[in-house]
Amino acid sequence: MKITTKVLIIGSGPAGLSAAIYTARAALKPILINGMQPGGQLTITTDVENYPGFAETVQGPWLMEQMYMQAKNVGTEIVSDYVEKVDLSKRPFKVFTGAGNEYDAESIIICTGAEAKWLGIASEQKFRGFGVSACATCDGFFFKNQEIVVVGGGNSAVEEALYLTNHANKVTIVHRRDSFRAEKILQDRLFKNSKISVIWDHVVDEIVGSNKPKSVTGVKIQNVHTKEISLLNCSGVFIAIGHAPNTGLFTGQIVMDDDNYIITKSGTTRTSVEGVFAAGDVQDKIYRQAVTAAGTGCMAALEAEKFLNK
């Protein structure tokens, strides 16, 4: 089936739903395709304490449900489907979905987000949200005066470790190589911090913990040379081996940086294609917060409205 719309929003995290709320209130009758993971990364986040407007801790899935209902109540058409292919060569832009529909859109707001890269071991999945995290800013507070392990060796790992010293008693970085890839200035700060220690030439073999209540108690790490396995006690494990934006759909059609994040014009959400906007983590490799994603979703909506009214 072919469907036409003034505004098509791809993605249903804080950026996409914020864009939907604003475009719906502007009477643009947006259609939002919610994607393979409706609600985005917050749907796998347990406690949220840093989203403005809530004096008490809220659950990530609950917060996304509220945004979803708000977007729907103001007139957004939300479609349970996912995008398989796009054609941004001319307007109206064409978007093809898994359900076999074709959407012809006068403007598109891309909110497909980014995903943390994970180790890919079963125990990591088991304890995700119960001691295993990929966001120190989001979850560091829960490990006050505890011992934490950070996995990685680039800028992300060093920055996460430095941040976590604001909360933890001790932070141990486990890195598979014998040196960091992080910037020299970050390494200097790390080595001067008495709360941080480094275990070189090791990888995480298994994350261990308790089921009642579900919580992390340590990690088994393996020496990459000797294959010897040892146990490192900790209460939390932060995976910091990078993020990957969900931009594969747009390769070759829109300008991206070397890490495949969509490039937007400074201070805006405008992309290299007129009429196509990008909001949230898909164009933000620095902050990656729910509140900043929602903010750029609002920006994209206002810019799309202005574009359509030209």
UniProtKB/Swiss-Prot annotation:
What are its GO biological-process terms? removal of superoxide radicals
Q: Which GO terms describe its cellular component?
A: cytoplasm
- Family annotation (NCBIfam families): TRX_reduct (TIGR01292)
* Residues reported in the UniProt entry to bind FAD: 34-41, 281-290
Q: Which InterPro entries match?
A: FAD/NAD-bd_sf, FAD/NAD-binding_dom, Ferredoxin-NADP_redctase_2, Pyr_nucl-diS_OxRdtase_2_AS, Thioredox_Rdtase
List, alphabetically, the Gene3D superfamilies matched: FAD/NAD(P)-binding domain
Q: Which cysteines are joined by disulfide bonds?
A: 135-138
Record EC number:
1.8.1.9
Q: Where in the cell is it found?
A: Cytoplasm
Q: Which cofactor does it need?
A: FAD
- What catalytic activity is recorded? [thioredoxin]-dithiol + NADP(+) = [thioredoxin]-disulfide + NADPH + H(+)
Q: Which SUPFAM superfamilies is this protein grouped with?
A: FAD/NAD(P)-binding domain
- Whom does it interact with, and what assembly results? Homodimer.
Is Oxidoreductase one of the keywords UniProt gives this record? yes
Further details from the record: The active site is a redox-active disulfide bond.
Q: How is this protein named in the record?
A: Thioredoxin reductase
Q: How many and how are cofactors bound here?
A: Binds 1 FAD per subunit.
Per the record, the similarity remark reads: Belongs to the class-II pyridine nucleotide-disulfide oxidoreductase family.
Q: Which organism is it from?
A: Rickettsia conorii (strain ATCC VR-613 / Malish 7)
Task: Provide a Gene Ontology MF annotation, just one.
Answer: thioredoxin-disulfide reductase (NADPH) activity
Q: Which PROSITE patterns match?
A: PYRIDINE_REDOX_2
State the UniProt keywords alphabetically.
Cytoplasm, Disulfide bond, FAD, Flavoprotein, NADP, Oxidoreductase, Redox-active center
